[in-house]
Amino acid sequence: EYLDYTNGDDQVNTAIEGGSAPDLIMEGPERLVANWGAKGVMAPLNDLWTDDAKKDIYESVNSACHNDKGDYYEYPLCMTAHCMAVNMTKVKEVGADKYLDTDKHTWSTEGFLNTVDALYKGGYENVAAIYCGGQGGDQGTRAIINNMYGGTFTDDAHTKYTADSAENIKAIQTLYDTDGINFDASIAGGDEITLFRNGTLQMAFCWNIAQQLNADNNDAGLTNDGDEIMPMAFPTASGDPKLCGGIWGFGVFDNGDEAKVKAAKTFIEFIAADPDQVRDSVLASTYFPVRASVGDIYADNAIMSEYTKFMAYLGDYYQITPGWATARTEWWNMLQRVGTGEDVATSVATFVQNANAAAAAEA
């Protein structure tokens, strides 16, 4: 059964409470490890994580798939990196393409702000939106704010939220003060994508390879009107972007049936670890391999091959921090308050207080 993000959590939680959880599920560490694993309803997969697997699977992925005691509740298959995008046709039109490294897909914070300014002065009143109508696409607003001046969303140990740092406050204030960037409580990430595609916005903070490949209204890599879409890492002052990632893999619910747990593990080994199968499994996902040994599986696909460059920019997978569900809600509420003119330091202090209270309650 395919579950969507509208009510999938409720369906699984209802099944768990009713004693009818599925034997096998494909999801990310924020659910398999930090949620269901922490609640004790998942079977440990430590035996699948052999020394060879640990050497082959990227360390950033490995570290997200186990808890602080070293118990693995996810065996990963594929991953992607979330990024942003710009209307490159319009950027060139206003002479701002000099601020973008289109080979590495990187730019500086100063270059980003100069690009926004050039577009705004070029007649594009709505360059970008800090969307905050809900949690949809919130990885984009977190990433633009964290990257601009080197802030973080959590501490390295994933025990508390750190959005009240001076770096984050500076970034939020800068975005609020910048002409052409508007805090918009009427839209979430999906709405922003629509507005970017139809030309209302000239930048999108909610982007990934699925969006770059989308051909619903025009060819892949083009807006509805045929403008070129350039995917970009988020701007940084350091030149070292840290992108939010998505990791997908398998978890096994412990339903008290050893035979079913064993069968589920056998399935996982075949789909996600068998040298003759794993490449095809990743290709079927349309995402990217978590194993170095799989190599460049998209060499014959120009868009996918180019997007592979973003994998090198993957940052910390902090979504496994306790209190995550509360933190996500508090985040867009905080952005809404900033958008109505509340002092930034006050807004983020409220966010951190509420998010860390939830983290402490779940720790």
How would you label these PLM feature ranges?
Residues 1-57, 71, 92-99, 195, ...:
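Extracytoplasmic "Venus flytrap"/periplasmic binding protein-like
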Residues 28-83, 226-235, 297-302:
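Hinge/lid segment of periplasmic solute-binding proteins
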Residues 28-31, 80, 189, 205-212, ...:
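Beta->alpha turn/N-cap motifs
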Residues 46-58, 98-105, 128-131, 151-170, ...:
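Short, solvent-exposed loop/beta-turn-alpha elements that line the ligand-binding surface or hinge
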Residues 68-77, 82, 108-160, 201:
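Extracytoplasmic/periplasmic solute-binding protein
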Residues 70, 173, 178-180, 219-286:
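Extracytoplasmic/periplasmic substrate-recognition and gating elements
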Residues 113-120, 157-187:
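Glycine-centered hinge/linker elements that transmit conformational signals in sensory
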Residues 276-278, 288-290, 295, 309-363:
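Conserved C-terminal helix/tail region of periplasmic/extracytoplasmic solute-binding proteins
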